[in-house]
């Protein structure tokens, strides 16, 4: 199951409000093939039939069944720093990540943080 930190919930509550919420539903988190490490996270506002529904106070998120194994145990946070602000995925299923931290690799038996890897894109932990 995906977990959202308080910072992520607060940011999403402000971002997904009003007409957007009424017309498009809630936030959908998915994993797709791509990125320099093999998989990338996707966030959008369109739910699809069959998605798992998770509620965090005022925020509802959807996770598609195909992405669920990659997202089990993931903690989504919202962080602000000198390089900007954005959502950070801490993924215990990742066996490696690219240097920019935007994509990850996953394989059987491995576990590490999806924090940016030293040495640049494609560097495994």
Curated annotation (Swiss-Prot):
This is Uncharacterized protein in nifU 5'region. One of its GO terms (molecular function) is 2 iron, 2 sulfur cluster binding. It comes from the Bacteria. InterPro entries: FeS_biogenesis, FeS_cluster_insertion, FeS_cluster_insertion_CS, HesB-like_dom_sf, ISCA_plant_cyanobact. GO terms for biological process: iron-sulfur cluster assembly. Belongs to the HesB/IscA family. Gene3D superfamilies: HesB-like domain.
């Amino acid at each position: 199951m995906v977990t959202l930190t308080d910072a992520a919930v607060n940011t999403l509550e402000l971002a997904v409000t009003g007409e957007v919420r009424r017309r498009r539903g809630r936030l959908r988190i998915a994993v797709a093939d791509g990125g320099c490490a093999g998989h990338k996270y996707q966030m959008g506002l369109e739910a699809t039939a069959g998605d798992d529904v998770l509620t965090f106070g005022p925020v509802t998120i959807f996770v598609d069944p195909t992405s669920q194994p990659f997202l089990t145990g993931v903690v989504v946070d919202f962080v602000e720093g000198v390089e900007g602000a954005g959502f950070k995925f801490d993924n215990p299923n990742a066996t490696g990540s690219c240097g920019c931290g935007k994509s990850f690799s996953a394989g059987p038996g491995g576990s590490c943080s999806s924090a940016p890897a030293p040495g640049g894109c494609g560097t495994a932990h």
